[in-house]
Regions:
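Membrane-embedded catalytic scaffold of the fatty acid hydroxylase/desaturase
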Residues: 56-65, 84-235
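Membrane-interface helix termini and inter-helical loops of multi-pass transporters
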Residues: 73-83
Length: 301
């Protein structure tokens, strides 16, 4: 199963490179045609190479550690409730079930700091293009696989799960572009570039919104949906201003562990690991809901 997942990703690499080149050309053509282009952030060389370096690191980690999450899921499969066959309807069922697992993984990766430490690098770019999609985490294999535990316990075969996880990852690639606008009725059900631009925004109104993988219906169902309105300011609430892939990958781990080490109480130490990003022991910190709340109050004033 692990080998099959890697094969799917490897086969997609030429497509990634070709579409990145096409997007770069289209953005450059737009800039040359319009003179000064201010509405799109576009590319910078250093940022794009940092994202590509993160993608290469992700592949290395996947090669080295691929068996860990798969072994865990395979172990859980022996306790399955049902024997789900590999037929057309089970693929449709898995499409929705896996996407729901992804939604909660992604949402909690924004709401629990130790999970955010693994995910933050994907949001660290102040640009939004197809290279941003490749700015993947090097540490998620240690923190993420447990969210897919319900699938083998229900009885989905491991190889089906791994293939569907790969399909979800590949679907999300095209979401990372400024070139595609809103998609009307399609966007009522499916995740789109417009929805995902919101997710990458550091605007207070956009923080921790639109966690969907394939289906945006989960955000609408669980109250985390926000349509694209004001211009998106990409990046983190506190940007890190570095193109060093190792700093991008591990800066939040270092910050989190430093905060926990310096905490005055065990409750504080636990809080710095498991509360929302922005939480502080003295209560002075601002989490995403607090920043959003303050913004809405200010807007209404």
């Amino acid at each position: 199963a692990g080998r099959r997942r890697m094969q799917l990703i490897y086969y997609a690499i030429p497509f990634f490179l070709a579409t990145i080149g096409l997007e770069w050309w289209l953005l450059g053509r737009s800039e040359r045609k319009e003179g000064t282009r201010t509405e799109l952030v576009g590319f910078t060389t250093k940022d794009s190479f940092a994202s590509l370096a993160m993608g290469v690191g992700f592949l290395v980690v996947e090669i080295i550690l691929a068996l860990l999450p798969f072994a865990g899921l395979a172990w859980l499969y022996q306790f399955r409730l049902f024997d789900i066959p590999v037929v057309w309807w089970s693929w449709i069922l898995l499409l929705f079930a896996e996407d729901l697992c992804y939604y909660w993984f992604h949402r909690l990766s924004h709401e629990v700091r130790i999970l955010w430490a693994a995910h933050i690098n994907h949001h660290s770019s102040t640009h939004y293009n197809l290279t941003t999609a490749l700015r993947q985490s090097w540490t998620t294999p240690f923190t993420g696989f447990i969210f897919w535990a319900p699938l083998p316990l229900l009885g989905f075969p491991i190889e089906m799960i791994i293939i569907q996880k790969s399909i979800s990852l590949l679907y999300q690639y095209w979401l990372h572009t400024e070139l595609i606008g809103k998609l009307g009725r399609f966007g009522r059900v499916f995740n789109t570039p417009s929805h995902h631009r919101v997710h990458h925004g550091r605007n207070p109104i956009y923080l921790d919104r639109n966690h969907a993988g394939i289906f945006i219906i989960w955000d609408k169902l669980f109250g985390t949906f926000e349509p694209e309105g004001e211009a998106v300011d990409y990046g983190l609430t506190k940007n890190i201003h570095t193109y060093n892939p190792f700093r991008i990958a591990f800066h939040e781990w270092a910050s989190m562990l430093r905060d926990a080490w310096n905490a005055k109480t065990w409750r504080g130490r636990a809080g710095y690991l498991f509360m929302r990003p922005g939480w502080t022991e003295d209560g002075a910190g601002k989490t995403a809901p607090a920043l959003r709340h303050d913004y809405l109050l200010e807007k209404q004033a």
